[in-house]
């Protein structure tokens, strides 16, 4: 990607590091090529990654509350022209993170916010050279970095050159690698509270049921008939049977009572 400006007139390195103070110094009124380079590469990066909006722009960087640093990979060509090869935007952010064991952390980490190499400049070591230059300039290790919405290409790049595998994806769309958490102390250690509570509740219910079924009071208590059982015809008292007065029992009854039975 060519730009009609000789960047060597203001840039001192082919991988140029620009802090916010540098960007303010290179104002668009006098150094239009700086803002143009950032905006052009930022737009190309968004299209390449399939993002709905451009996330790297000159004005956004200088207006951002947090300090961010931009790296521009470029080269001089014949005449007053330069070729833009790639861009890398980084900055420190405080993130809420969770490891694979569900421990929670609040960490200020170096974040990789945008990383793009022009397709025609890829597979030539340009990406590794720029990324490695950034790590050295910022004095940070790759496993100490957090990556904002890492693409499949970036994950392959990190695995190929830095042996970083199996990123731990976060709910905030950032990703870190397992070694990020080594030596860090969680702000909220994971404790399976829900599991313990459920276990205690289950034990209490089981204990209550067992004690109710094996109570010595209930075990020896006489059985009471239900209302339905009492209403059955067979349970009502039977009427008195009529005694034949000519039977032995009838003679005895008449003799004992000295009168005839009245029923």
Swiss-Prot record:
Species assigned in the record: Caenorhabditis briggsae
Biased composition (Basic and acidic residues): 253-263
Ranges for region Disordered: 191-224, 236-263
Binding site for acetyl-CoA: 115-128
Protein name: Alpha-tubulin N-acetyltransferase 2
InterPro entries assigned: Atat, GNAT_ATAT
Molecular function terms from GO: tubulin N-acetyltransferase activity
Low complexity bias (residue ranges): 200-212
Biological process (GO), any one: neuron development
Domain N-acetyltransferase: residue ranges: 1-181
Function: Specifically acetylates 'Lys-40' in alpha-tubulin/mec-12 on the lumenal side of microtubules. Promotes microtubule destabilization and accelerates microtubule dynamics; this activity may be independent of acetylation activity. Acetylates alpha-tubulin with a slow enzymatic rate, due to a catalytic site that is not optimized for acetyl transfer. Enters the microtubule through each end and diffuses quickly throughout the lumen of microtubules.
Family: Belongs to the acetyltransferase ATAT1 family.
Classification via Pfam families: Acetyltransf_16
Keywords: Acyltransferase, Transferase
PANTHER family attached to this UniProt entry: ALPHA-TUBULIN N-ACETYLTRANSFERASE 1, ALPHA-TUBULIN N-ACETYLTRANSFERASE 2
Reaction catalysed by this enzyme: L-lysyl-[alpha-tubulin] + acetyl-CoA = N(6)-acetyl-L-lysyl-[alpha-tubulin] + CoA + H(+)
EC number in record: 2.3.1.108
Keyword Acyltransferase applies: yes
Assigned GO CC terms: microtubule
Source organism superkingdom: Eukaryota
